Amino acid sequence: MQAEQIVWDQALIEKYNYSGPRYTSYPTALEFNESFGYPDLVRAAGQYPARNLSLYVHIPFCHKLCYYCGCNKVITRHQHKADQYLDYLEQEIKAQAPLFKHRLVTQLHWGGGTPTYLNEAQTRRLMDMLREHFQFAEEGEISIEVDPREIELTMLDVLREVGFNRISLGVQDFNKAVQVAVNREQDNDFIRAMLERARALGFRSTNLDLIYGLPHQNRESFHHTL
């Protein structure tokens, strides 16, 4: 495969080269306060009854800690904890869905944590819960973040079967020294196999997540990753 030269827009870089909040949630944690009660939520939910919905489901569990991560997470290999989490999530879905019962879901995203921490049965259970309580658009975007270190290739078949049409592979960097430094070693050949499998299964969109600013990265190494 021939590498293409990357042209950087320096004006665009300078325009956005400043610090800002890290949106691990929206609104950010600082915006939450006790003055906003359930009646306020009900009023807010009813303000735009004709608008479509975007749903985000947070799966906080990870098998291993990535040293750069600032997301809300639980590091554990006790799979039963995910079952307990889904029990509580089901209560939340049942409580909130009636507020949006006439609105169409055009986007659904599972993030984390590691959404593919869930096994096949747990994945099917969660998707069934969502489809039972929300109305989904036929051509809506249904996406999930995938950790290529902690998934069987056949799990992509399950994800496609339950309705996912977009996957995002958390690669971050292909350089082994960088991977070791952030505790995220992975198999490049397996990532290639995942991309080929996703293409064969008909996923509408497949992307790779990359991070710049990790230990041992430089222009040359990141150019290799790109």
Labelled PLM ranges:
Residues K73-F100, V105-L226:
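Conserved non-cysteine loop/helix-boundary elements of the Radical SAM core domain that shape
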Residues T28-E31, L65, V74-I75:
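A short secondary-structure junction motif
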Residues S54, Y67, I142:
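Divalent metal-dependent hydrolysis catalytic cores, especially in the metallo-beta-lactamase
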Residues V57-K73:
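Local cysteine-cluster metal-coordination motifs and their immediate loop/turn environment
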Residues M1-L53:
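Flexible, acidic/Gly-rich N-terminal and inter-domain linker regions that tether
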Residues L55-V57, L169:
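Short beta-strand motif preference
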Residues Y48-P49, H58-P60, K101, A200:
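Short glycine/proline-enriched loop/turn "hinge" motifs that connect secondary-structure elements
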